[in-house]
């Protein structure tokens, strides 16, 4: 009796795999949808909106980092400015990945300057001193970290490609926060 139950449990865990013919037929059906197949279960409209807000966040963060890169002055400014530039370039990579995913989902990436700050989770705060700049960037990274964690939870298993992309971005944002916290601790 126990063997029978064990067999049933493992059978329940194993998803039924489609035949090659079925996979091929599904791929040909609604081909105009591109990467979005019948197995996609997320609400695309909501995911695209979340991604456009994340896109705005990445662009605003890039702009702030670029300003801080050019405005950094003081004894340790060169090393801190290099960190700002590295982060700015990584934010551009994130924005590009997000925009590409939006298009894959059949949406349009919103690069409108008129609404960037309004849609961004993080604020654009210029900062006056080098220490202010580091603090503002750290605050923005902490906001991004929380918003990406919420997005990952909201998406769940409904869109694994988008979730993995956001998890990758989240890992980089956490590195940014660690870098900036280290600069604060060092008193730059």
Predicted regions and their residues:
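Iron-associated oxidoreductase/ferritin-like identity signal
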Residues: 1-188
